């Protein structure tokens, strides 16, 4: 069965009308690109070497849709409306990384209603997979919006080796910055990241974005993926609490998270008990929906099986331990 390259809707060749509108301003774009990775303007993310995947992630910038195609080059003055990522060549299951990020972003958005950047799965001219996302730091008039990541907001310092001192910053520290509404959203994102095996949600993977009213709110999610498919990653990127529950353990021991830890973080954020209970119920019964979407994804059969194992393992740990 064919699925939409954007939302994975059944019986769709290419993109459904809804994804054409959200991603390409109603243009009928071919998911088979006419260019290759080598043809694109690109940068290597300037993350410290200590990052598991982001430290070597390369992003390309492509322009507006022209007819039925995306443009691989930007003329002077043009804006890079889309970001494109190739496969991760240096990790396990490299060809699955674009489909991994794509399906993880879709699960966050469709199953849990988490705000995410609009994204899709595509293929380069040579057939290799690509992940494409529409930038959210431009408004409808293509005017640049202010965006600042939490490495900057929390003023994370680098040590002499160039690595961020992650032990000095925790997810609890985000509560000093986030609005009450954003704190609820943030808890839901953290639970989702744990369940999907995202051990790479560092300070730079969260941002505040300027709204139409000029204030700064938590941006849509980006860079969501199951990092366990590609590296032997930690369960979460940062400690939940300022007590440093993860990194304070003796070497070789691992902190076993349960849903009560996330509830405790919610309590410290002063989120109402009834709302926290509602969040727990929402996630408790969603594993089957996640498995169905993984089954429809563009992942290889091997990657699908490993992703399903991640979901089963983390659901057991979070809700049954």
Give, region by region, the residue ranges found by the protein language model.
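Anionic ligand-binding catalytic core segments
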Residues: 1-203, 207-321
């Amino acid at each position: 069965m064919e699925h939409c390259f954007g939302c994975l809707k059944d019986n769709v060749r290419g993109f459904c009308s809804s994804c054409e509108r959200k991603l390409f301003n109603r243009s009928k774009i071919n998911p088979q690109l006419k260019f290759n990775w080598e043809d694109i303007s690109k940068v290597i993310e300037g993350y410290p070497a200590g990052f598991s995947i982001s430290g070597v992630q390369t992003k390309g910038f492509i322009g507006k849709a022209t007819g039925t195609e995306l443009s691989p080059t930007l003329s002077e003055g043009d804006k890079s409306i889309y970001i494109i990522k190739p496969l991760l060549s240096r990790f396990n299951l490299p060809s699955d990384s674009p489909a991994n990020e794509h399906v993880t972003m879709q699960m966050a958005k469709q199953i849990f209603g988490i705000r995410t950047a609009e994204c899709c799965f595509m293929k380069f001219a040579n057939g290799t997979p690509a992940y494409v996302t529409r930038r959210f730091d431009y408004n409808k008039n293509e005017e640049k919006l202010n965006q600042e990541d939490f490495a900057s907001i929390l003023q994370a310092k680098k040590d002499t080796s160039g690595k961020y001192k992650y032990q000095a910053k925790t997810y609890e520290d985000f509560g000093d910055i986030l609005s009450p509404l954003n704190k609820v959203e943030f808890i839901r994102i953290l639970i989702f990241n744990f369940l999907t095996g995202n051990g790479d949600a560092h300070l730079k993977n969260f941002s505040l974005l300027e709204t139409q009213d000029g204030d700064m709110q938590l941006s849509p999610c980006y860079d969501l993926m199951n990092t366990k498919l590609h590296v032997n990653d930690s369960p979460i990127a940062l400690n939940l609490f300022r007590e440093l529950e993860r990194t304070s353990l003796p070497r070789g021991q691992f902190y076993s998270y349960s849903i009560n830890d996330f509830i405790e973080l919610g309590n410290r954020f002063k989120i109402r008990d009834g709302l926290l209970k509602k969040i727990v119920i929402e996630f408790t019964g969603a594993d089957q929906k996640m498995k169905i979407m993984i089954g429809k994804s563009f992942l290889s059969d091997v990657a699908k099986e490993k992703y399903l194992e991640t979901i089963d393992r983390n659901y057991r740990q979070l809700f049954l331990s």
